[in-house]
Amino acid sequence: HLLQFNKMIKFETRKNAVPFYAFYGCYCGWGGQGRPKDATDRCCFVHDCCYGKLAKCNTKWDIYRYSLKSGYITCGKGTWCEEQICECDRVAAECLRRSLSTYKNGYMFYPDSRCRGPSETC
């Protein structure tokens, strides 16, 4: 669920998804095209690819079980879809944390019109 993903992002990065990631680069937020702009944007690209493999799941709204303890995100038991969505979100949130040192404020509200060219394949 998007709100759960936001909590994971906040836990890992200490930043709220909105405004820091919702419109970042070419892939953070809805959709995406072109080449990822940097490591943070690549985290979002990989997250989009992860969700893309779950076409039969309601990736944005399915509620899953997870815990935030001792500095770690742990996905809990649930349906196959819930567990897979949680893993996509967990991996992305951890990726965003690893990319904090190269986060660029200039990509925070990056216009889609500047995301041109062919998209990479997943």
UniProtKB/Swiss-Prot annotation:
<feature type="site" description="Putative interfacial binding surface (IBS)">
    <location>
        <position position="18"/>
    </location>
</feature>
<feature type="site" description="Binds G-45 of CBa2">
    <location>
        <position position="18"/>
    </location>
</feature>
<feature type="binding site">
    <location>
        <position position="48"/>
    </location>
    <ligand>
        <name>Ca(2+)</name>
    </ligand>
</feature>
<feature type="site" description="Putative interfacial binding surface (IBS)">
    <location>
        <position position="103"/>
    </location>
</feature>
<dbReference type="GO" id="GO:0016042">
    <property type="term" value="P:lipid catabolic process"/>
</dbReference>
<comment type="function">
    <text>Monomer CBb: The basic subunit of crotoxin is a snake venom phospholipase A2 (PLA2) that exhibits weak neurotoxicity (10-fold less than the heterodimer) and strong anticoagulant effects by binding to factor Xa (F10) and inhibiting the prothrombinase activity. In addition, it shows the same effects described for the heterodimer and binds the nucleotide-binding domain (NBD1) of CFTR chloride channels and increases the channel current. PLA2 catalyzes the calcium-dependent hydrolysis of the 2-acyl groups in 3-sn-phosphoglycerides.</text>
</comment>
<feature type="disulfide bond">
    <location>
        <begin position="26"/>
        <end position="115"/>
    </location>
</feature>
<feature type="site" description="Binds D-95 of CBa2, important for stability (T-70)">
    <location>
        <position position="61"/>
    </location>
</feature>
<comment type="subunit">
    <text>Heterodimer of one of the acidic (CA1, CA2, CA3 or CA4) and one of the basic (CBa1, CBa2, CBb, CBc or CBd) subunits; non-covalently linked. The acidic subunit is non-toxic, without enzymatic activity and comprises 3 peptides that are cross-linked by 5 disulfide bridges. The basic subunit is toxic, has phospholipase A2 activity and is composed of a single chain.</text>
</comment>
<keyword id="KW-1203">Blood coagulation cascade inhibiting toxin</keyword>
<feature type="disulfide bond">
    <location>
        <begin position="50"/>
        <end position="88"/>
    </location>
</feature>
<comment type="function">
    <text>Heterodimer CA-CB: Crotoxin is a potent presynaptic neurotoxin that possesses phospholipase A2 (PLA2) activity and exerts a lethal action by blocking neuromuscular transmission. It consists of a non-covalent association of a basic and weakly toxic PLA2 subunit (CBa2, CBb, CBc, or CBd), with a small acidic, non-enzymatic and non-toxic subunit (CA1, CA2, CA3 or CA4). The complex acts by binding to a specific 48-kDa protein (R48) receptor located on presynaptic membranes, forming a transient ternary complex CA-CB-R48, followed by dissociation of the CA-CB complex and release of the CA subunit.</text>
</comment>
<dbReference type="GO" id="GO:0042130">
    <property type="term" value="P:negative regulation of T cell proliferation"/>
</dbReference>
<feature type="site" description="Putative interfacial binding surface (IBS)">
    <location>
        <position position="17"/>
    </location>
</feature>
<dbReference type="InterPro" id="IPR036444">
    <property type="entry name" value="PLipase_A2_dom_sf"/>
</dbReference>
<keyword id="KW-1015">Disulfide bond</keyword>
<keyword id="KW-0964">Secreted</keyword>
<comment type="similarity">
    <text>Belongs to the phospholipase A2 family. Group II subfamily. D49 sub-subfamily.</text>
</comment>
<feature type="site" description="Putative interfacial binding surface (IBS)">
    <location>
        <position position="2"/>
    </location>
</feature>
<feature type="site" description="Important for stability and high toxicity">
    <location>
        <position position="1"/>
    </location>
</feature>
<feature type="disulfide bond">
    <location>
        <begin position="43"/>
        <end position="95"/>
    </location>
</feature>
<dbReference type="GO" id="GO:0050482">
    <property type="term" value="P:arachidonate secretion"/>
</dbReference>
<keyword id="KW-1199">Hemostasis impairing toxin</keyword>
<feature type="site" description="Putative interfacial binding surface (IBS)">
    <location>
        <position position="3"/>
    </location>
</feature>
<feature type="disulfide bond">
    <location>
        <begin position="75"/>
        <end position="86"/>
    </location>
</feature>
<dbReference type="InterPro" id="IPR016090">
    <property type="entry name" value="PLipase_A2_dom"/>
</dbReference>
<feature type="site" description="Binds Y-43 of CBa2">
    <location>
        <position position="18"/>
    </location>
</feature>
<keyword id="KW-0479">Metal-binding</keyword>
<feature type="binding site">
    <location>
        <position position="27"/>
    </location>
    <ligand>
        <name>Ca(2+)</name>
    </ligand>
</feature>
<dbReference type="InterPro" id="IPR033113">
    <property type="entry name" value="PLipase_A2_His_AS"/>
</dbReference>
<feature type="active site">
    <location>
        <position position="89"/>
    </location>
</feature>
<feature type="site" description="Putative interfacial binding surface (IBS)">
    <location>
        <position position="7"/>
    </location>
</feature>
<keyword id="KW-0106">Calcium</keyword>
<protein>
    <recommendedName>
        <fullName>Phospholipase A2 crotoxin basic subunit CBb</fullName>
        <ecNumber>3.1.1.4</ecNumber>
    </recommendedName>
</protein>
<keyword id="KW-0872">Ion channel impairing toxin</keyword>
<dbReference type="GO" id="GO:0006644">
    <property type="term" value="P:phospholipid metabolic process"/>
</dbReference>
<feature type="binding site">
    <location>
        <position position="29"/>
    </location>
    <ligand>
        <name>Ca(2+)</name>
    </ligand>
</feature>
<dbReference type="GO" id="GO:0005576">
    <property type="term" value="C:extracellular region"/>
</dbReference>
<dbReference type="InterPro" id="IPR001211">
    <property type="entry name" value="PLipase_A2"/>
</dbReference>
<feature type="binding site">
    <location>
        <position position="31"/>
    </location>
    <ligand>
        <name>Ca(2+)</name>
    </ligand>
</feature>
<feature type="site" description="Binds Q-49 of CBa2">
    <location>
        <position position="14"/>
    </location>
</feature>
<feature type="site" description="Putative interfacial binding surface (IBS)">
    <location>
        <position position="60"/>
    </location>
</feature>
